[in-house]
Amino acid sequence: MYKERIEAVKNSLEALECDALMVLSSDAHLNEYLPLHNRRLQAISGFTGSAGTVVLMRQGHSHLFVDSRYHIQAEEECGSLFEVHKLGMEGVFEAHKWIGRQDLKPLKIAVDPFTITPKQWNRYQSGWEKTGHRWEVLEGNAVDQVWENRPEKLNYAPFALGEELTGESSISKLGKIRDMMKQNGAEGLVLTMLDEIAWLTNLRGSDIAHNPVFEAYAVILQNRAICFCHHPDSGITKQRPEWEFFPYDDYLGFIQQLAQESSGKIWLDPEATTMGTRTVFDNSKVLELQNPVVMAKACKNRVELNCSEQAHLHAAAALVRTLAQLEERMESSLPASEAWFAELLQKEYSSEAGFVDLSFPTIAGAGSNGAIVHYGTPSDEKMLEPHEMLLVDSGIQCEGGTTDCTRTMSLGEPTSKQRELYTSVLQAHIRLAKQVFPEGTHGAALDSITRSGLWNQGLDYGHGTGHGVGAFLNVHEGPQRISPVSHDVALKPGMIISNEPGFYETGWGGIRLENLCRVKTLESGLNHHPGGKAWLGLETLMFVPFDQKLIIRDKLSSDELNWLDDYHEKTYQKLQKMLNEPKYLNWLKKACFPLEA
């Protein structure tokens, strides 16, 4: 199937007189998690990961570029048809840089402009100046044209959230955004990203699995707020009278008219708009800056934080019940598979008040599968073995909050290697959880601090240490992150971010320990900063015990022991009232027993 599609695309490239096609893992809204009908990278390659780039050469091999999360997965899924470029390995280049090194002749690279940002477009093009390579804009999408039996587009009517969940009305949010537009001299603002539109409208949807968003565009003017969606007549106008709702397909015609009639600047975020939208407007009429919704959404208000805290308690209670049942089953020597565990966890999650959906498909990787960072569908054939560990990464969408938690558990008596490595990863987690930092600190600095103990042992992990998370929105949210990749956004109070160091060894397994945290201002107990800056820290939101069988107590410092015992004490106090059955309460009490005792 994939081979035939690749050949069909190559034939179309020949007809278009193009040398290559670039297929990115995005769509017209730059989604990370895609609806089925927009998974073009998967349709052309078979790769099911959430991030990657395909380059199909009209003559020669097909190429797939993936980061370290997907090295193993990409080889397993696509290695027979694609040359897999494992980013992060020595001598391996990103897709656009690899293209830049093909210097026998200038190349025409075809791309769908509605899947690439202006920032990407310009960065790639500037890197090709010496070779003369250039973009070729496609009318339509080349993959769509060869994708037989493409899934139907799912679009549902959005639903409104009250201020008891959002903490602020859409009218108030629009007022603040318009003030920032005035300050920056913008007549209009165009929004493409679905979580930004959902946040600004105080609407949610179910057009993408596990992401409570609806497919839409938005245009904000000083006297109008227009939303282009699939159900403009569904009754949301009565709930949001400050907005005008039009059919989704009217968007392109509207911005074309806006481009002709506007006399002022139109604000387009170069990292959150597609080149398809950007090319509608003359350069002289475009204000290219990060749009004002990005930071407003990232820094949660008190209501959003309270709702997130409640969501985490519900998720923690469900996860504790599941872990208790897992331990009971393993001790009884009853058969259990990865799929059994994932199904049990979803059952427990869905029983919690306010549950809406999982926040992403559960990762339950046993043994060597734990080394696949974004392991796919848990297998009903992979049985849980007593000598192995189980890595579980899961979360929920709960009314008002989004969770994401990873725990790695021993399924029997752990080996010395498992305990050594688990304890090292736990120490990295504690290091970040305890870290104090001045305002203005970027995530790259905290990333290095978190990894330092692992580095001293010759250990590391290929993914970032932390990603932002939304408030009943996407489980991956920008711009905040804790990563080696430098980013120009400092961590600010109210941001929610993950703390998830790890270790992975192909053929052996993986360890990851993840809690979500909120960035907060530290009010007392610290010296005055010489620059007058506030001191910030992270407050943990998730409370699920760490596996004490895997912890080498004597390897922990007194400060680390105190942090861990305090964390487990808080875990017990917060969850004991949510666990009605004695067997779960007894399991929790045992799991939270202080190591210093």
List the model feature ranges, each with a label.
Residues 1-597:
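Active-site neighborhoods and metal-handling regions in enzymes and metal-associated proteins
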